[in-house]
Amino acid sequence: MVNFEKNINELQEKLISVNRVSKTVKGGRIFSFTALTVVGDCQGKIGFGYGKSKEVPLAIQKAMDKARKNMIIIPIVCKTLQHEINGYHTGSRVFMKPASEGTGIIAGGAMRAVLEVAGVHNVLAKVYGSTNPINVVRATVNALKKMRFPMHIAEKRGKSIDDILG
């Protein structure tokens, strides 16, 4: 993971990875760069972007723009998750569960960056299968999209919140 952080308009931006890729043509190879970034407001709003260009700064800028356009809202209370969640994308599977206050973010690589910009401070997480950063970010975002407030679940089932929480 590349160490790159920026705060613009209360959004925290993190660069997860930059790769050099090549296209082979008759005259040789054409090199270009890809960048994967995540953007969040540390209060439950998060987005990720993937940009590609012939130069690194342009690839990063494209990725940041895409991340700002594709933001979603996730329910976070007390700086942790509501319940255990699983997510997957292609060969990557992620498992996350809430942790008590003071635990911190126990997660690796790309998943850590996503959880930090989302505003989650206490979580236990694990990646199974492929650790490709793009797939891990997509799996993490898919898992976070599935999370629901206990109040909404209780309403849907026609029960009280106490019944849902056990």
Swiss-Prot record:
SUPFAM superfamilies named in the record: dsRNA-binding domain-like, Ribosomal protein S5 domain 2-like
GO biological process: translation
A GO molecular-function annotation: rRNA binding
Domain S5 DRBM positions: 11-74
Swiss-Prot/TrEMBL keywords: Ribonucleoprotein, Ribosomal protein, RNA-binding, rRNA-binding
One GO location term (cellular component): small ribosomal subunit
Protein's UniProt keywords contain Oxidoreductase: no
Organism domain of life: Bacteria
Pfam families for the chain: Ribosomal_S5 (PF00333), Ribosomal_S5_C (PF03719)
Matching HAMAP family: Ribosomal_uS5_B
NCBIfam families in UniProt: rpsE_bact
Subunit annotation: Part of the 30S ribosomal subunit. Contacts proteins S4 and S8.
Family, per entry: Belongs to the universal ribosomal protein uS5 family.
Name of protein: Small ribosomal subunit protein uS5
Lineage of source species: Bacteria, Pseudomonadati, Pseudomonadota, Gammaproteobacteria, Enterobacterales
Protein encoded by which gene: rpsE
